[in-house]
Each structure stands twice: as C-alpha cells, then as structure tokens.
Design a protein with these regions (language model features):
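Glycine-rich, Lys/Arg-enriched anion-binding loops that position phosphate/diphosphate groups
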Residues: 184-283
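N-terminal catalytic cores of NTP/NDP-binding nucleotidyl/phosphoryl-transfer enzymes
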Residues: 51-109, 114
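Residue-level signal for inorganic ion chemistry
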Residues: 68, 122, 161, 221, ...
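Short hydrophobic targeting helices and cationic amphipathic motifs
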Residues: 7, 15-17
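Phosphate/ribose-recognition catalytic cores of enzymes acting on nucleotide-derived substrates
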Residues: 238-354
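Positively charged, low-complexity intrinsically disordered leader regions
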Residues: 33-57
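N-terminal Rossmann-like or analogous alpha/beta NTP/dinucleotide-binding catalytic cores
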Residues: 100-165, 169-187
C-alpha cells in the first residue's frame, strides 16, 4: 500500500514537471522570464534577518537594477563560489531604492525593473536566498564598519563575499574593496572582486541601459539586459479617438511610478495578457495631432488582430524597436495614413526578426 501511494505521488510530481516544461517551452522568450520560476526551485525571500539562516552563506550586495548581464556575471560567480565551499548563494538588496531615502528631493529616479520584476529575474537565476532589506533613514546612517560587523558578520555570518568592480557601500558610500579586504582578514571570510563586463568595448551598467532606453536604442538596451525590456501596467479608459480612425488603442497606466518610460515615439512591441501574446504598435507622447496639452504624456498601444474591451486588465509591453519620433499631422486622415504605414513596417519587422 505504501509503495502504491509513493508511486502515485511520484507520477503526479513528474507529470507536473512535464506540464511546466511544456508550458514554458510554448511561450515566447519574453514571457518565459516570468514563467521559468515554475520549473526552478523558488528562492527563499527574507525581508528581515531575525530568522535568516543559510549554510556557509556566499553573498553579494547591491541594488541590481535591471538584473543585467553584468549582474548575472556576479550571480554566476556566486553560484560557483557557493558550490566550492558547500554553501548557499545569497543576494542582499534593498527596498526602496537607496536614492529614494538619501536623496528624496531629486525626484528623477527611473528604474529598469520594479521590485516584482527583479524578484522574478532573481528566481530565474536560481539563487538560494534573496534578502530584501528595508532601506530606512536609520539604516542609511550605518557606517561601512557597522554594516560589515553587525549585518554581514553578526547576522548573516557571511563566509564568502563577491563584489563588482565599482562596489561601494555604507554611509556616503565610503566603504570600498580595500576596506573589505581588511574586514575579510579580521572576521575570517573570503572576498573576491570581479572585473567589469564589457560589450563592444564599453562596460555594461544600469546607467548605460537607461540612456539607451531613453534614446530608443533597444538593440543596445536589450543586448545589455540579456532579455527584452518590459513595462507593466493597467489598461485604463481613454478618449476612444483611435476607434474613429480604425486604430483602437489600449491606454496604459504604468504599475510603478519609478519605472523608466522610453522617450516619445512609436515602438514595435509585443503585448502579453491573459496568457496570450500579440504584436502591436505603441505610442508614447503627448498625441499632438489631437491634444493641445504638450505636458500630458500618454502610453497607448494598438494591438494587432484584437478588438475587445480589456479595461482593468494587467498588461505587459515588451519593447523591440523604435520606429519613429512622435509627429503632429495636419489632419486625422493624415494620421490614419501614417499609422497604416507604421503597422506595415512593424509587421515586416516581426516577420524578418522571428
């Protein structure tokens, strides 16, 4: 009886894994980023350190905005070092982003990834532990000495620390690699600094990727990210002007006000919602042909081969290419003619870039 029960449980687990694999395999690449965690073991997420425990923790620290290829180089080293000492990989990151606390008046923070997106990308990387530490005004006042002694050593019991080429931490970012080497000797943990990851002789950084996105250079941005840039939002009601010219659009309100929005223009995108994916053309801008308010930015997408009301739906926009700048046309008919050309160009792009 016990053997029969064991066989049934084993068959059910195996069937579930096969289902997950088939499901993920059937999705386009950009959707697999948010589905692959079905087949990965889930990361253990910690929002405080009171009950944190890991075997021989191998740790890295940072904001990891974008979880781009430079970050993934660090995460890969994290896995290797954890394996070498029979340890577990740990990423220590922050919420909110430190700049929102130490420089709240700047108001120009633009993130490549929301916290939810970042968690999913970390899960995709297969790490063991993710610490999302509350970045408070009090925490920001910790000196680098206090942070190492109280947090890295006193609470996490770090055995190996992996840092990037430009890593600095602590109050006013005064802690650097030379200081960490002294701490490693004092507190008996190992440390390694990784070289910068280059692409086309330029270093990969979150700043470089943000600049590329603002300029509409998604070839550079997506290459550096290692995946297609995504924007999540909710479909809200608009003025329904698109229907009058046979190009109905879904108006999007971004899910996170700190998420970077590409510059004004027309883009080739894929649209994901309700486990479906569509091609589409997206306009970001002030809609100067039909709107006199130049300060109002709208995000609206015309979804190809789709015409249903989806108000309130959560939607994912995946960016492939910037087609052109936003323009003001002399009439709605001229706008309609240009949109028809845009659609033809985008369909051609997707046909030639499968």
């Amino acid at each position: 009886m016990k053997i029969r029960k064991y066989l049934i449980v084993t068959i059910c687990r195996f069937s579930f894994l096969i289902f997950c694999w088939l499901f993920v395999s059937s999705l386009p690449y950009e959707m697999t980023i948010f589905a692959q965690n079905l087949t990965h073991r889930l990361v253990k997420i910690h929002t405080d350190l009171n009950s944190f425990h890991a075997q021989n923790p191998v740790l890295t620290i940072g904001t990891f905005d974008g979880v781009h290829l430079g970050h993934r180089k660090i995460i890969s080293a994290l896995h290797d070092r954890a394996k070498s000492i029979n340890g577990e990989s740990v990423i220590f990151t922050f919420d909110p982003h430190p700049r929102k606390v130490v420089a709240p008046d700047e108001g120009n923070l633009r993130l490549l990834t929301t916290l939810d997106e970042k968690i999913t990308l970390f899960e995709q990387c297969g790490i063991d532990h993710l610490i999302i530490y509350p970045f408070t005004p009090e925490f920001s006042q910790l000196t680098y000495e206090e942070f190492v002694e109280k947090v890295l050593v006193g609470q996490i019991h770090t055995k190996f620390l992996v840092v990037g080429y430009d890593h600095k931490f602590g109050k006013n970012r005064q802690g650097d690699f030379e200081f960490l080497k002294k701490c490693a000797a004092r507190f008996d943990f190992q440390i390694e600094k990784l070289d910068v990851l280059l692409m086309n002789e330029a270093n990969i950084s979150s700043t470089k990727i943000r600049e590329a996105i603002q300029q509409g250079d998604f070839k550079t941005a997506n290459d550096c990210l290692g995946y297609k840039f995504m924007l999540h939002g909710t479909v809200v009601e608009g003025q329904k002007l698109g229907r009058k010219i046979q190009f109905p659009t879904a108006n999007i309100e971004a899910s996170d006000p700190d998420k970077i929005i590409p510059g004004y223009g027309v883009y080739a995108v894929r649209v994901n919602f309700q486990n479906q994916t569509f091609q589409g053309m997206l306009n970001i801008g002030s809609r100067p042909t039909v709107n006199n308010n130049a300060d109002h930015r709208s995000i609206e997408v015309h979804i190809f081969d789709f015409d249903s009301d989806i108000y309130g739906e959560q939607i994912e926009l995946v960016f492939f290419q910037k087609l052109r700048e936003e323009q003001k046309f002399p009439s709605l008919e001229a706008l309609k003619d240009q949109l028809a050309k845009d659609k033809t160009n985008i369909l051609s792009y997707f046909k030639n870039n499968k």
